A protein has these predicted regions:
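Hydrophobic, small-residue-rich transmembrane alpha-helices and their short perimembrane loops
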Residues: 1-148
Length: 148
């Protein structure tokens, strides 16, 4: 049983990076597809579409920082909290990345037809980013209370 707890602990240490990267990749792909379509339909301003499509990549950065904050010798005593925090924040980053990609795709679609709303169209993506920040901050706070 102790070995399983240690294995799960190590899984929890790496989960934020893996799941954050997965969410970022899916989100960037969704927004990137919208950017490619928008570039076909507009004459200029391609850089803003590409820039917006990169917004979901922040989730993997949060995952990397969380991984470093969780990194320690994994024991049967701290394996369960490491697994719980790491896997739950990883799942949050996964979903935020996907939904942020969708929000960015919508912003791209809206602003290609009406460029003057570009900044406002990004607001939903920024709001979704806030949930990643909440998960990130709470994971950092909880990671500090896990015994080494």
């Amino acid at each position: 049983m102790n070995e399983l707890v240690v294995i799960l602990g190590w899984l929890g240490v790496y989960a934020p990076v893996a799941l954050g990267a997965l969410g970022s990749a899916i989100g960037v792909a969704i927004a990137g597809q919208a950017a490619a379509g928008a570039m076909l339909e507009t004459e200029s301003g391609y850089g803003r579409f590409v820039g917006v499509s990169a917004i979901p990549s922040s989730n993997v950065i949060y995952g990397i920082v969380i991984m470093f904050s969780l990194q320690r010798a994994v024991t049967p005593e701290n394996g369960a909290p490491l697994f719980a925090i790491g896997s739950l924040v990883g799942i949050a980053l996964l979903y935020v990345g996907i939904w942020q990609g969708r929000a960015c795709a919508s912003a791209i679609a809206a602003s290609k037809n009406k460029p003057e709303i570009f900044g406002l169209a990004l607001a939903p993506a920024a709001i979704v980013e806030g949930f990643a920040v909440f998960a990130f901050v709470f994971a950092l706070v909880l990671a500090g209370s896990i015994p080494a």
